[in-house]
Amino acid sequence: MKGMIMLISCLMLIEVVVGGKEGYLLDRSNGCKRSCFFGSTSWCNTECKSKSADKGYCAWPSCYCYGFTDDSKMWHLKTNKC
């Protein structure tokens, strides 16, 4: 039983370490979230990949990205300038 708990804990830790960061794409020109009001999921996916993320989609009205590298800049509520 202890072995099973240890295995599950290790798998969860691996997911956290390997999964990368996720969040809203930062529009560096104004410090806000990158809007996809007139865009699409494929447009957001391309934008996210251009900013070193693995993939992204339009979480209307802003682009949401998965798999950012550790040095990637993303939008944060605490540093929100909008």
Swiss-Prot record:
Expressed by the venom gland. The keyword Protease does not apply. It holds the Pfam family Toxin_3. Residues 1-20 form the signal peptide. Keywords: Disulfide bond, Ion channel impairing toxin, Neurotoxin, Secreted, Signal, Toxin, Voltage-gated sodium channel impairing toxin. The keyword Secreted applies. One of its GO terms (cellular component) is extracellular region. PROSITE patterns: LCN_CSAB. Transmembrane segments: none annotated. It comes from the Eukaryota. Residues 21-82 form the LCN-type CS-alpha/beta domain. GO terms for molecular function: sodium channel inhibitor activity; toxin activity. It is found in: Secreted. Disulfide bonds join 32-82, 36-58, 44-63, 48-65. Has the structural arrangement of an alpha-helix connected to antiparallel beta-sheets by disulfide bonds (CS-alpha/beta). Beta toxins bind voltage-independently at site-4 of sodium channels (Nav) and shift the voltage of activation toward more negative potentials thereby affecting sodium channel activation and promoting spontaneous and repetitive firing. Is toxic to arthropods. Belongs to the long (4 C-C) scorpion toxin superfamily. Sodium channel inhibitor family. Beta subfamily. This is Toxin TdNa6.
